[in-house]
Swiss-Prot record:
Subcellular location, principal: membrane
Vacuolar side: 100-101, 166-192, 258-423
Designated name of the protein: Metal tolerance protein C1
Gene Ontology molecular function, alphabetical: monoatomic cation transmembrane transporter activity
Function: Involved in sequestration of excess metal in the cytoplasm into vacuoles to maintain metal homeostasis.
InterPro entries assigned to the protein according to its UniProt record, in alphabetical order: Cation_efflux, Cation_efflux_CTD, Cation_efflux_CTD_sf, Cation_efflux_TMD_sf, CDF_Transporter
GO cellular component terms, semicolon-separated: vacuolar membrane
Residue ranges of the TM segments: 79-99, 102-122, 145-165, 193-213, 237-257, 424-444
PANTHER family: MITOCHONDRIAL METAL TRANSPORTER 1-RELATED
Topology of this chain in the membrane: Multi-pass membrane protein
Cytoplasmic domain ranges by topology: 1-78, 123-144, 214-236, 445-471
Domain of life: Eukaryota
Amino acid sequence: MGIIRFQILNPTRICRSTIYYMSCRYLPSSSSSSSPLRVSSSSSQKPSFDFSRRWHFGHPDHHQQYQKPGEEGEKIFRLGLTADIGLSVAKALTGYLCGSTAIIADAAHSVSDVVLSGVALVSYRAANVPKDKEHPYGHGKFETLGALGISAMLLATGSGIAWHALDLLSIALSAAPEVIHSGHHHGIDMNHPILALTVTIASISIKEGLYWITKRAGEKQGSGLMMANAWHHRSDAISSLVALVGVGGSILGVNFLDPLAGLVVSTMIVNAGLKTGHQSILELVDAAIPAQQLEPIRQTILQVEGVKGCHRLRGRRAGSSLYLDVHIVVDPFSSVSVAHEVGEYVRRQINLNHPEVSEVFIHIDPAFLQFSCSTKDHDSITKESNICQEIKHVEATVSDIFSSQLSEKLTIKRITPHLLHSKILLQIVVAMPSTMSIQDVMIAAEHAEKEILKAAPNVARVSIQLSLNSE
C-alpha cells in the first residue's frame, strides 16, 4: 500500500521523514512490505533525522554520573575549611605577638573565611539533596540565603576594621614628626619580624594553592559555587599580600603603612560583602541570567537536528544550580511523538554539555510557513473564538462535503488539522473504489479542495492524499 499526494504541503521532505522515522521505530521489519509508512518513506531523499542512535542518553543515568564528583567537591570544601581555621589561628597569634594591625585585620578576614567556608560546605551539601515534596524545585535557595548572611557579616567585619585602622592611621600621622626627630619608631619588635613575614608568606602560598585546586575542581564539575570559592581564595591571597606590605613598612619604621594596609584590607572585605550580597539578592528575586552567559546553551540547542530555531531562552539561579526555560521551533508537520523526542534530545544535550543546569523546561513551537491566502475570507482565527470548536466545525464541514458530493468517488479515512500562524491547514487521507481511475480521483480531489475552501473560510490550505491500503 502507499500514499499518493495530490497536493504537497510544505515542507515535503520533513513530512516524509516523519513517517519514515515512526515506521523504523515502531514497526517490525517483517511487516515493512505491507506497511503504508514504508511505501511513503521510499523517497529518494534520504532522511537525516535519526533518533535510534540517541536514545541511550537516559535521564536517570545522567544524574548517576555526577554523584561521585559531588563527593569530590565536598572534600575540596573541607580542605578549604581546614586551611582557613589553621590560618586564622596562626595570623591571630602572629598579629598579637608582633603588634601588627595589618596581620590582625587579615586574621579577622580569615575568621570570616572560616564561617564562609563552613556555610559553603553546608550549602553545597544542602544543594545536592534530592528534590522532595516540600522542595520540588530543589534546595538551591538555601545556598543563596547562606551567602546573603555571609555578606552581611563581611560588611560588619570590614567596617569595624576600617574604623580601627583609621583611628590608628590618624595617630600614626600625628606622631610622625616626633618619630622622625627622635629617631625612634613603634614598629615591630625586631625579635618577631621573621615570624610575621613567614606567616604572611605562608598564607599567600596556601591561599593561592587552594585557588588552583578549587578552580580545577570547579571547572571539572561545572560548579559555580566552587568557582566563586576559588576566586575568594585568591582574594584572600591578595589581602595577605597587602598585609605583607604593612609588615614591611613597620619593620622599616614607616608607621602609617601598617594601619594603611589594614584599611586597604577592610576595603576589600567590604567590597566582597557588597558583591556577594548583591548577587544573593538577585538570585532571591529570580533575576534573569545575562544573555551572554546563556549564549553557549543557545548554541547547544541550535546544533540539535530537528530544531529550526529557539527563542525566549531565559534562566535563573538558585545557588550553584541553573534553571532554564526555552521555546524551540520544530517542523510543523511532525507528529507529536517526534516533536516530543526532539525536545527530550535537546534536554539531554543541555544536561550533557552544561552540568550546571539542574532543570530545563522546554516548550515546543511549530515553524511558521510563509503562505498567502487567495481571498480575504481566509483571515486568521479571532482570539475570542474557541480553536477546538473551530476545528470540529471544519471537520464536520469536510465530512458533509464528501458525503453529499463525493460519496461514490472518495471516502475519508483520516483528517489531520494543523494550526499554523492562526491558520487551519488540512491533511485529508481518502480511499477510492477499485474501478475508479487515478485521473478521475485527481479531478474529484480538486473539486473537494475548492468546496472546502469555499465552505470553511478559516481553512487556508488543503492537502488531499490517496491511500492505497485495502483495509
